[in-house]
């Protein structure tokens, strides 16, 4: 009976759960409860098993304490201490050579010691913006260690993604805003062309100024970014993209007046070394309306995106920004600084007030001598003085202006192929066009040598007719000026509700481009027009062909724009076409989800077209990009395109609004607008008097080294599909052989790895 009871007890004592009750030999406990002979000896682990455990040990944790070192006869407190020693692991910062403020901080007096830079200046790839002067050991002993300047090093999180030209740009910006390039001046103009990463460079500048300085403390405590309303969300996303959770910007893109005032007051009232939301992102319109709140305190830095809108010092936006209490000002403009002396003065005066003197001093010292020297009747002395003053002006401006062209992108981006496609008008368009020229008052007045400002709005009618007759059908029904008696020209039973692409040369070509692209590739397409009515036609075409599409125009809210763009850029999105109003969202949008873009109609302002065409060929693009600029051959569209390409001061060839046409066109030039050359394959090519073409056929290729930025005379000229690098346009030319008359085409740079 006793043996039967003892056996189960013996078995239980050998179980793993009873390990704590067993005592080692020679222990202080009673020997009768301890039976060493009953304990099975542990199996020795092989060396391979031990090595396998060590191989997968994380570098950021120490090995667990081995259980074999367990002390005998633990009480509860000893046991808890033992478990804590097993689970403990030292914290290790994953950033190499990090010298940040995460170490232990003691209350009380500040401990003496040598000041250190926030980031290691000797680390490989470090971007050092400031290097303190080297001191001898003797000088270091004499100087106060608490006052020694330190290196300013860009955060490695950012410096490792900056390209060489961006590193150079960040250094230039930092030197300008810290008054190291021009003593006493703290502003600069970032005028890089589109796609060179101006936003990233400015974010790097802000983050550096907010975190460090040679004095071992932040240079600024707050920064304000002012941008067009369509880019507020984009700036917010970019800050999050590059800085992650390290900073929380405040973006204001809507709300009531009281709500916005409350947010701005909260932003301005922030104080201390670590401001919770040190970056404010706000639109120009909201800034202008609420500048009173922002004037109540000081701001360390203001950045004005799309800053070319500040070229007029008389407008309210300029004056509101100029009243802000900050000397550090950065103006971003991807648009070329226009060759207008007054604009030079306004922009430079905004960022660095007084560097060019007052407006009167500037006019006397620079403007008048330069203009006088340019005059055709200028004396040799005047011409020499004008050139001298121009060189002086450029030397001053270049100290606070940095501009790099997009040819830098050729190192990082795939090839871009630009194609100017001249399309023949259909018989319906031709007849309507000719009737309008015969009947419209503007044409009649110009033939008589008169020019009426009010009647020049009919230029819009011609431009819309070039897009599609459906856009002027209502004018024909109502028999508006120039379209009297034209209703009978339309086909029997015609209705503008249903789109008929074959009635427009450009729409027919677009229909083929979309169809070939859809059937032969996975490419997506961006369609751009100046008119929302034309976007309506695009919608009808997409619905008829069952293409999935998204549309962005002035009616879409800023929040929804960001969602639409993000969805379209997602590779898994089924959307094929992105319709864009150039007036509503031409600037700042990143549409790298598409690699084909069609400019359906030209704008008077070349900057608007350039902005729109840069939406797809930008950082992050992986495919070869194809840009199509569609023009109706021999019409007003070619005249507009020629004005864009003309080598004149942009102040005299850019027209912002159609009612301003009379300020920029002579009577003879206006007469040319109201003409139609039916026989011309391309009026633009005819005016080039091209020596490389014989009977409109290219015989000699363009000069070596020519690219998209070269003059049209140095592009390829084609009257057939042979020589085109775009297979889609080749196929479209086959299908619409009578619709395409001429193509100018050129690439951004030589291909390195073949077409995608």
Regions found by a protein language model. Give the residues of each.
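ASCE P-loop NTPase motor core, strongest for the SF2 helicase catalytic module
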Residues: 2-33, 47-49, 134-375, 394-412, ...
């Amino acid at each position: 009976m006793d043996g039967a009871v003892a056996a189960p007890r013996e078995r239980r004592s050998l179980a793993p759960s009873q390990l704590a009750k067993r005592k080692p030999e020679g222990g202080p406990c009673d020997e009768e409860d301890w039976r060493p002979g009953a304990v099975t000896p542990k199996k020795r682990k092989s060396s391979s098993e031990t090595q396998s455990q060590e191989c997968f040990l994380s570098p950021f944790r120490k090995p667990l304490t081995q259980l074999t070192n367990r002390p005998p006869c633990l009480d509860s407190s000893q046991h808890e201490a033992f478990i804590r020693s097993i689970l403990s692991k030292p914290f290790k910062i994953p950033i190499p050579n990090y010298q940040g403020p995460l170490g232990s901080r003691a209350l009380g007096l500040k401990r003496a010691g040598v000041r250190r830079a926030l980031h290691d200046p000797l680390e490989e790839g470090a971007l050092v913006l400031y290097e303190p002067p080297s001191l001898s050991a003797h000088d270091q002993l004499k100087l106060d260690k608490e006052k020694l300047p330190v290196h300013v090093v860009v955060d490695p999180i950012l410096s490792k993604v900056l390209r060489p030209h961006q590193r150079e740009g960040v250094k230039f910006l930092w030197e300008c805003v810290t008054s190291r390039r021009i003593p006493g001046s703290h502003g600069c103009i970032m005028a890089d062309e589109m796609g060179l990463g101006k936003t990233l460079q400015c974010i790097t500048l802000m983050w550096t100024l907010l975190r460090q300085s040679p004095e071992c403390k932040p240079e600024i405590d707050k920064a304000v970014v002012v941008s067009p309303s369509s880019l507020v969300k984009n700036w917010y996303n970019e800050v999050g993209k590059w800085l992650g959770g390290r900073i929380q910007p405040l973006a204001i893109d809507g709300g009531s007046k009281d709500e916005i005032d409350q947010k701005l007051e909260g932003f301005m009232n922030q104080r201390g070394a670590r401001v919770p939301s040190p970056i404010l992102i706000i639109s120009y319109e909201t800034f202008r309306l609420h500048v009173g709140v922002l004037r109540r305190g000081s701001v360390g830095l203001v950045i004005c995106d799309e800053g070319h809108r500040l070229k007029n010092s008389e407008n309210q936006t300029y004056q509101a920004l100029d009243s802000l209490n900050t000397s550090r000002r950065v103006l971003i403009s991807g648009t070329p600084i226009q060759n207008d002396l007054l604009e030079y003065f306004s922009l430079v005066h905004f960022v660095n007030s007084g560097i060019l003197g007052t407006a009167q001093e500037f006019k006397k010292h620079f403007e008048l001598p330069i203009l006088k020297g340019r005059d055709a009747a200028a004396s040799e002395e005047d011409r020499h003085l004008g050139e001298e003053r121009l060189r002086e002006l450029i030397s001053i401006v270049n100290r606070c202006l940095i501009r790099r062209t997009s040819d830098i992108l050729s190192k990082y981006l795939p090839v871009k192929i630009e194609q100017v496609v001249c399309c023949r008008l259909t018989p319906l368009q031709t007849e309507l066009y000719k009737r309008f020229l015969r009947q419209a008052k503007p044409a009649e007045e110009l033939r008589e040598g008169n020019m009426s400002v009010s009647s020049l709005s009919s230029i819009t009618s011609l431009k819309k007719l070039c897009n599609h007759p459906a856009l002027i059908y209502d004018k024909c029904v109502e028999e508006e000026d120039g379209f009297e008696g034209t209703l009978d020209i339309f086909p029997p039973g015609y209705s503008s509700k249903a789109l008929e692409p074959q009635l427009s040369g450009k729409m027919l070509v677009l229909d083929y481009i979309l169809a070939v692209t859809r059937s032969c590739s996975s490419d997506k397409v961006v369609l751009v027009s100046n008119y929302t009515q034309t976007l309506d036609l695009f919608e009808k075409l997409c619905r008829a062909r069952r293409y999935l599409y998204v549309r962005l125009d002035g009616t879409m809210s800023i929040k929804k724009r960001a969602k639409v763009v993000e969805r379209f850029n997602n590779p898994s999105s089924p959307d094929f076409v992105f319709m864009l109003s150039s007036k509503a969202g031409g600037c700042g949008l990143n549409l790298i989800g598409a690699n084909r873009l069609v400019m359906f109609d030209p704008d008077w302002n070349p900057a608007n077209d350039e902005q729109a065409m840069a939406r797809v060929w930008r950082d992050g693009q992986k495919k070869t990009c194809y840009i199509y600029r569609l023009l109706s051959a021999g019409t007003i569209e070619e005249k507009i395109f020629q004005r864009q390409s003309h080598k004149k001061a942009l102040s005299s060839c850019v027209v912002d609004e159609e009612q301003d046409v009379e300020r920029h066109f002579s009577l003879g030039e206006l007469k040319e607008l109201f003409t139609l050359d039916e026989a011309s394959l391309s009026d633009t090519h005819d005016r080039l008097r091209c020596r490389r073409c014989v009977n409109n056929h290219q015989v000699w290729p363009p000069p070596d080294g020519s690219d998209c930025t070269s003059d049209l005379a140095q592009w390829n000229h084609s009257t057939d599909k042979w020589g085109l690098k775009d297979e889609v346009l080749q196929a479209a030319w086959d299908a619409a052989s009578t619709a395409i008359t001429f193509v100018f085409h050129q690439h951004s740079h030589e291909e390195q790895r073949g077409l995608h």
